[in-house]
Amino acid sequence: MVLVGICFLAGLCYFLFPYFNSWMVNNDAKKEIESFEVLKEEKNFDTHDLLFEMMEDYNNKLYKDGQNGISDAWTFDQKDFVIGDYDFKNDVFATISIPKMNLEMPVYLGASKENMAKGITVLANTSLPIGGKNTNSVLAGHRGYRGVPFFRDIENLQVGDEITVNNYWQEIKYIVSDIQIILPSESEKILIQEGKDMITLITCHPYRRNYQRYVVYCVREDEYKKDGNSVVHQGSKVVKSSKNDIMIERYLPFILLLILIIF
């Protein structure tokens, strides 16, 4: 009986860990967002204006230089623009809100392992998310990590859905314009598109595997309307949806726990 009890407790801990970790990460994310909002309200205009100018210069140079060195997010490249140099307390630069995914998360500069374990990240050698012509900020997130959803439900997004990026200067609305599946090596598929103001969401695909990338292209709201809902890319690959795998993972532990309790 003692052994059975120990096995039951071990199984229960294993079952509960993802939910506990998800609660912890989401709670920390909520605090980071609240801290971000406070800093935004209390911003030093001289420092913030200088930072904005430096970021614009960075984005312009990135476009002119052709984004040399861009690579897959899961190589965990470190950040190449440090906002701590401008008297900021942390690397939270913005927040992202995706109603269709019931997601609100802080956005960190640099797709490091640490940053990707606690939020959404800006891929190195892509535009900083401040908007503007000739920009494409590639925002990377795990397809679920240790119980935290992150971009797990990205397949819920459809063309026409709204995504909001809130940085220190403005709130920018983007509209999903196209969805593609690409290979990790196809970095040319996430480059800046001439004349466009974009963000691109990227995560692993299929779910629980990482040999492909699920990519959601989004253009700024006014551009989406002006262009007559035209897409930036044309997807060509037919792929299997991960929704069934996600559903099984979500409910199977409860079924197994119920069976364990009954028997």
Region spans (language model):
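Solvent-exposed, non-transmembrane regions of membrane-associated and secreted proteins
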Residues: 1-251
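Selective detector of the "anchor" transmembrane alpha-helix that sits immediately C-terminal
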Residues: 249-263
